[in-house]
Amino acid sequence: MDKLNVRDVDVAGKRVFVRVDFNVPLEDGRVSDDSRIRASIPTIHYLATHGARLILASHLGRPDGKVQDGLRLRPVAERLSQILGRNVPVTGDALGIGTVDAVKRLRNGEMLLLENLRFHAAEEKNDPVFAQQLADYAEIYVNDAFGTAHRAHASTVGIARLLPAYAGFLLERELAMLSKLMETPARPFAAIVGGAKISGKLKVLDELLKKVDVLILGGGMANTFLLAQGKTVGKSLAEHDMVEEARRVLALAEKKKVKVILPVDVVVAKEVTRGTEYKTIPAEKIPASWHIVDVGRATLDLMEEALAEAKTVFWNGPLGVFEIPSFAHGTRAIARFLATRADSGATVVVGGGDSVAAIQQQGLAERFTHISTGGGASLEFLEGRDLPGVTVLQDRPVLTPAEKGAATKRAKAAARAEAEAKKPAVTGRPAG
C-alpha cells in the first residue's frame, strides 16, 4: 500500500487541508495527554516550513452533531500553540463566512484549526455537500489521522475524492510499521491481546494465528477462553455465546502450532469497584460470587518467559480492569517488561487503547518501537481490511528503473538544497 506523501507535492503558497487526529483527553479545560498532537507535528512542521497555508481539522469526542462547549477545540489549539511556539487560532465553527475569511487571510507558513468537525452531523455521514464545503478551503488534502482512517467520513473520504490527496508522515509511518509487523516480523513473534470482549477481536485473532509463534490472552476476553477450557469464572465478564468460537480459536492455534498462554492464576474481587476485597487464586478455583479483575504473578511469569525470547511483539488491550489502580498491576507490569525487551533490540509495537495509557502513565513511551495512535484502525488493518481513509489517497505510480534513478537524483538534489537553505548566511565585507 504505497501512497504518495507530502514530499511528493509542491505545497509552497498552497492552501493545504490537513486532517489530524486531535481527539485527546481533557481535564479541567486542559489537554491531559498531548501524544496525539505531538504525533502530527512532523507533518505540520514540514508543510509550514515549505510555505503551505495550513487548515488543520479534527474531531473531539462524540458530540453527535451538536455544539457542546466541553468539546470545543480551544484547549487543543492552545496546547498546539505551546508545542509549536507560535499562535494557532481556532475558528468559531468549521463552516461559515468568518471561517472562509480566516482561511483567505492565511499567509505562507501560517495555520489555523477548524472547530470540532463533529459539531456537524454531516461529518460522520460523509455528506457530499459538507465534504465540498471543506474542500473549497484548499487546493491539496493531507491525511495524517490514522486513528480515523477506518471511518468513511466527510473529512477522511469525501474531501479526499475532491482534491489531490496525500498521506502525512504519521499515517505513512503507521502503515509501514503495521505492514512490516505482519509481513516480515523477526521471529519468534508474540502477540498479547487483551480487553473486554472476544467478539470484537475474532478477526484479528484469526489473522494473528497465521503469523505468530505465541499468543497471550488476557483481560475480560480471556475469561471466555477459560470457559472454553471447562473452567468456571464466577461473576466475571464473559461472553457465553462466544465459547464455541473460543474453542475454535484454540483448536486453530493447536493446528498451527501456536503456543497459547492463558491465565493460570488470577486476581479476583468481591466487586469491580475501588476499595473492595480482592485476592489471588488459581484459575481453577474461582469462587462463584467473585469477579476476575487481573492476572496473577504466576501468569505474569509465564508471559514474561515467553516474551523474553520474542524478537517481535504486538500488544493490544489491558490484562485486567485497568481503570481501577488495584487491578492494573498486570497491565503495568507487562508494560515495564516490554520496555526492557525493546531496550534489548526487540521490535515492540503497541496497538492503541488502554495499553498505551499503561505505558504513558509510567513514562515508558520513548522506549517502545512504535505506539499506534489508532486502536480501532490498527486492528482493522491487521485484519486485512481496507481502511477507507487510506484507500482514497493517491497511489504511488510504478516506475521503470530509469524513472526510479531520476527520482532518486531529484530527491537527493532537493535534500541538498534544503540542507543548504538551513545553513546560516555568510556575512562580511564585500570583496574588493
Stretches with model-predicted labels:
Residues 415-419:
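Intrinsically disordered, low-complexity, charge-biased segments
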